[in-house]
């Protein structure tokens, strides 16, 4: 939230009641809204469906395989009693992270936090996740056909490294080589040549080690526009287009596994990374949100060390990360 400095105490009063004394009167109304939004985002949308299937296929044991809000059957079953019990277990001051950025002092912030948060039971800290994901033993594939969807979607995930480890920063740099900036490899070698509508790579922040993801959308296949095709033939045409894009994406990974990134390319992505991070932190709200998220994941000091850790990444680190993590037996394709 963004509030005037002289309204800080009122904000503490309101937010503490919202967090720890919520009203449940509109639970079932809001539940229906959430169900509709979930269906729109994950059931009827190729992009959302691809993300859902990617994580459900890549993970067999770790909770990362489940959507944050649960599956359709979970939402249908949720009751007010379930929500109240979940809130009682997890929404307490011990689990809360409060970050304030702006015209205030530490003493003022501490006094207000103690006044408005300590009036509630401290509660217990959420337990750590103890279920580890077994090592993937071979490639996995999931295919979904959405009726009426015109733009096919490709997602390729590889089990990666946890945040704040040397390999995580190497994979971050690798993703930037592939897709950060207009001269990135996937843009230059695939999109600009008209071989696909989009192509990108990402290394999402994950406390327990997430997925390094390649993604994109192929061009609409010429075969799908031929008159008289039945549904099965159209599906075959779209699937072949997706498989063609998958081959192009994996070919770029192969290059990174055999060739070192040039000094010029490495300098370019580090410069872009520094600029993008500074741009993301221009507002007080962005700084607060970033620090709060990082504190929950690995600790807020990660932000103060990030650029230094990224600047230390070498071309050899990038190639080693590609060889270690982006292997066929760790690949999941959707």
Where are the language model's segments positioned?
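M16 family metallopeptidases and their MPP-like homologs
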Residues: 1-17, 46-73, 95-101, 150-162, ...
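Active-site-adjacent, His/Asp/Glu-enriched structural segments that form or flank metal-binding
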Residues: 1-48, 77-80, 84-95, 115, ...
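Surface-exposed patches in mature extracellular/periplasmic domains of secreted proteins
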Residues: 23-30, 47, 123-126, 259-266, ...
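An aromatic/glycine/proline-enriched structural segment found at the starts
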Residues: 26, 60, 68, 93, ...
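Short, conserved secondary-structure transition motifs
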Residues: 35-41, 132-145, 271-280
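Short beta-strand/turn micro-motifs at beta-sheet edges
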Residues: 84-88, 141-145, 198-204
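Extracytoplasmic/secreted cell-surface and envelope-processing proteins
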Residues: 106-110, 166, 223-225
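Active/ligand-binding-proximal structured segments within catalytic/core domains
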Residues: 156, 166-178, 186-190
């Amino acid at each position: 939230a963004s509030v005037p400095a002289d309204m800080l105490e009122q904000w503490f009063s309101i937010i503490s009641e919202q967090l720890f004394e919520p009203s449940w009167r509109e639970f079932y109304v809001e539940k229906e809204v959430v169900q509709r939004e979930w269906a729109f985002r994950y059931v009827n949308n190729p992009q959302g469906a691809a993300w859902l299937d990617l994580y459900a296929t890549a993970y067999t044991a770790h909770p990362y395989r489940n959507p944050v809000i649960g599956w359709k059957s979970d939402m249908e079953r949720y009751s007010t009693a379930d929500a109240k019990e979940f809130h009682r277990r997890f929404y307490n001051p011990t689990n809360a992270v409060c970050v304030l950025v702006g015209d205030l002092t530490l003493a003022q912030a501490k006094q207000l936090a103690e006044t408005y948060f300590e009036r509630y039971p401290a509660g217990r800290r959420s337990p750590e996740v103890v279920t580890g994901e077994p090592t993937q033993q071979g490639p996995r594939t999931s295919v979904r056909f959405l009726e009426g969807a015109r733009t096919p979607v490709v997602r390729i995930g590889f089990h990666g490294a946890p945040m704040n480890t040397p390999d995580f920063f190497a994979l971050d740099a690798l993703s930037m080589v592939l897709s950060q900036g207009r001269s990135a490899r996937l843009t230059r070698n695939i999109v600009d040549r008209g071989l696909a509508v989009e192509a990108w790579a990402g290394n999402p922040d994950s406390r327990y080690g997430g997925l390094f993801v390649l993604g994109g959308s192929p061009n609409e296949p010429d075969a799908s526009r031929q008159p008289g095709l039945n549904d099965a033939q159209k599906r075959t045409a779209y699937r072949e287009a997706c498989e063609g894009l998958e081959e192009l994406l994996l070919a770029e990974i192969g290059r990174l596994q055999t060739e070192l990134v040039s000094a010029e390319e490495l300098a370019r992505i580090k410069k872009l990374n520094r600029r993008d991070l500074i741009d993301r932190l221009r507002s007080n709200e962005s700084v607060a949100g970033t620090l709060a998220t990082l504190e929950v994941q690995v600790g807020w000091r990660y932000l103060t060390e990030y650029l230094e850790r990224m600047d230390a990444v070498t071309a050899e680190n990038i190639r080693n990360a590609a060889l270690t993590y982006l292997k066929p037996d760790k690949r999941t394709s959707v």
